[in-house]
Amino acid sequence: WVPILESWDFEERTDLVAPSLYHAIYHYLAYVIVEDDLGEEVANNYANNWYFWQERIQDLVVQDYGRYWIDDQRTKDQVEDLHDLIRRAARLGAAKLQAISGDEPTTLNWGEIHKISFVSPLRPGGPGSRLLGGGVFEKEGSGETLNRAGYSRTANIEDGFDTSFVAAARLVMDLADPEKIKAVVAGGVTARQFNDHYDDQIPVWVDGELLTWWLSKDKILEQVKTKLTLTTNVKEMD
């Protein structure tokens, strides 16, 4: 793993192996740091909630006081350092990657284990869900990147790194231009199943592109392709 991680440019692209290895280690780092103090069950519950530990763990691994947490209290005849726990987390991470895919971890690209699924609330899972949904795509990035695509941590070794929260809407605004913005949403602008605009922005969103959204009424009318007219058919009552 070391040569792959040493040559990594820290970009979490879908075609790279290094992000898979990094997140496999990071997945277990908080757990192995506190497991000797809290026990297996509580340590897993703690590590499963990013908001409980992320800033604290990242702070203590670079601060001197962190050595008191990093040392394993169960080994009275030795003092563990961060490198020891990273190696321990890597062994657990390797087993997890193996359980997820059955492949050798050093051949597993990030996109193979980090995907995003667009589902319909009418049928979020089971038979027919793919028909009603918007598709499954490999997803770059993570919860710490621009266009974030974070995953939920669980104690189940077979649970992967599929995306569970994202930056759903992206927007670029020129404050000197009152007529338009550049934006895209992860889906479409209508929630009506089978409508043309239910999922038509997904390909643009997945590719990291933006669309022009007109704000000026005149410009909107210039771009009109279809028009919806709402009328009433209420008869006058005698």
Language-model regions, residue ranges each:
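Long, compositionally biased non-active-site segments enriched in small/hydrophobic residues and glycine
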Residues: W1-D238
